[in-house]
Amino acid sequence: MSTKAYKGGITLKKLLCFLIIAVMLCGCSGGSDLTDRAMALRGKLQAAGGCVFDVTVTADYGDKTYTFAMGCRVDAHGNLSFTVKEPESIAGISGVIDNSGGKLTFDEHMLAFPMLADGQVTPVSAPWLLYKTLTGGYLRSGVQEAELLHLQIDDSYEDHALQLDVWLGAGDLPVRSEVLFQNRRILTLLVENFQIL
């Protein structure tokens, strides 16, 4: 069975699904407070001059894990610059990541991790993926878990989307995220000192 697609890859079935959801949401009287909080964070990030945060990333390859810590700064255009802080053997490596890719700079050190999720993401790009998803991903759900707001967000509207579970803490700022591909956690991000500029 063939489905006709519009430019950009949206099939008629997906378009119909989006229209039905939009009609149902129009009938809602106030929206979910949890969704409102998630969308408020998105609005703040989109309107801001950027943000800064520290993150510890763990990449899970199934048979092996790698953990490293980075300091990150996102500018008003969504470009993320980072510097590796730990482990000491790769500390000082820095780079920039944006929609077009990334660039690393280093002295006598190399930061090389295999690709994850069928070549969609590298561990070093995980903080940029978190920011990109918070500012423009498809919000699937939100639930309160004790003092944390747990969001499920797809990084895109595509069939091969990565799913991010994001936990917001005090001030509705991110404190943790997990990136899943085909229902398997491939990346864990522990976020500290998140500040919107």
Q: For each of these PLM feature ranges, what is it?
A:
Residues 47-50, 73-80, 96-101, 146, ...:
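Short, solvent-exposed coil/turn segments at beta-strand boundaries
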Residues 52-55, 67, 95-99, 177-179, ...:
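Extended beta-sheet lipid-handling architectures
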Residues 27-74, 79, 197:
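N-terminal leader/targeting segments and the immediate start of mature chains
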Residues 141-197:
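Gly/Pro-enriched, hydrophobic low-complexity segments
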Residues 74-129:
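An acidic-aromatic
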Residues 57-61, 74-78, 86-88, 168-170, ...:
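Beta-strand elements of well-folded, non-transmembrane domains
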Residues 1-26:
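Sec-dependent bacterial lipoprotein signal peptides
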Residues 64-70, 89-97, 159-161, 185-189:
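Amphipathic hydrophobic-ligand
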